[in-house]
């Protein structure tokens, strides 16, 4: 949908800009398309997953490592430069996709992509390299950032789907289908919970009723 919407917006924008800018139709079409596509890929997933959390979870120090790695990778992109530096945050974003929820992953991807677009536009990240094609730098940068942004979002939703299936499997294994109470194996696993203190005495009575 983002690709189709970006193409339609690019056609309308290029036609309307021909009489204003001194460029031809095709360079304007490429510029409009790259801008609309990168913006859509970054913003639309973030808006679709946006929600107000009911209870703010407690973050531990080790849970912040993917976000810290993401910040370090963006700084490395600025320091090293070059066209390949735009892909430096990709491993950190995939790490975030594995560890965080889709909502947090989409938000981090949006912020990272927006920061990289601003840095490239202001020449903070220098991606100027010799190329046999006369392609504007921002066109290449926008498409590269949009492509990078798709990967962690796909991983995040794949991990969320796998976790949902695992919860369904655990629910069927640990709970009785009719009564929705613990099965024998589920009760044993619950009793192994580390929240139960070792000094705490506990009496368990099992009543197995055939139905």
Each model region followed by its residue ranges:
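Membrane-embedded alpha-helical hairpins and interfacial helices in multi-pass inner-membrane proteins
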Residues: 1-83, 87, 91-99, 112, ...
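Conserved nucleotide-binding and Mg2+-coordinating catalytic segments in signaling enzymes
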Residues: 170-190, 207-210
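Short, flexible active-site loop motifs that bind/organize anionic cofactors or intermediates
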Residues: 95, 152, 177
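Cell-envelope/extracellular polymer assembly enzymes that use nucleotide-activated donors
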Residues: 203
